[in-house]
Amino acid sequence: MDYRNQSLGALAIAIPQATKLFRQHQLDFCCGGKQTLLRAANKLNLDIDALEAQLSALQTEPHSSEDWQQQPLTNLISFIISRYHDRHREQLPELVLMAEKVERVHGEKPTCPRGLAAELSAILEELTQHMYKEEQILFPMIQRGMGSQASGPIFVMEAEHDAVGQQLEVVKQLTQNVTPPEGACNTWRALYTGINEFITDLMEHIHLENNLLFPRALRGE
């Protein structure tokens, strides 16, 4: 199968386990989901043949992931809210508190991620507003069968997805790609574990919206 000329978003839909592989290689399948595997791999100097072999192996593995290409959009929306929106509302406040503690206790160390708490607070504020707009405006439009008329709100939501993607890059820079330094305390390690989980969740969340929900809604499904 020709994987290299397919978009990252299409591959993530067709091979659900591919999202973990893409994350390992820093391949942006959510906000950058429209670029082909070949183009994305070339940007990062990745071995395209090795990536295709890994994707081929993943495609033969059995999996139990929901096929959201076939499910009604109302079901997909309910899943996004319960699995991702509600989860982000739990994750981010705790991450902010832990980041504040790490900066307060370890602020004099050169490895301290100074500015991380402020960046996470900004993500919390902006993502909270973003999810509210989706739940109060865009999702009800789609649920009422008006998705084909929602190009304006969808454009805004995708732009906000791009913005939070840039904020995640700042978080990665502040945390040495979310890697705790040698000798990091338990709070520091727990913070970075939580950030990694949040990034994984958010990328899957944006992928489902950008590459599945929004295109299907615009087609009038």
Swiss-Prot record:
Subcellular location: Cytoplasm
Keywords, comma-separated and alphabetical: Cytoplasm, Iron, Metal-binding, Stress response
Keyword Transmembrane helix: no
GO annotations of cellular component type: cytoplasm
Subcellular location, principal: cytoplasm
Molecular functions (GO terms): metal ion binding
CDD domains: Hr-like (cd12108)
Protein's GO biological process: protein repair; response to nitrosative stress; response to oxidative stress
Protein's UniProt keywords contain Chaperone: no
InterPro entries for this protein: FeS-repair_YftE, Hemerythrin-like, RIC_family
Pfam short name (any one): ScdA_N
Source organism, top-level taxon: Bacteria
NCBIfam families with a match to the protein in the record: FeS_repair_RIC (TIGR03652), PRK10992.1 (NF008221)
Role description: Di-iron-containing protein involved in the repair of iron-sulfur clusters damaged by oxidative and nitrosative stress conditions.
HAMAP family (UniProt xref): RIC_YtfE (MF_01606)
Family indicated by similarity: Belongs to the RIC family. YtfE subfamily.
Subunit structure: Homodimer.
Stated name of the protein: Iron-sulfur cluster repair protein YtfE
Organism: Yersinia pseudotuberculosis serotype IB (strain PB1/+)
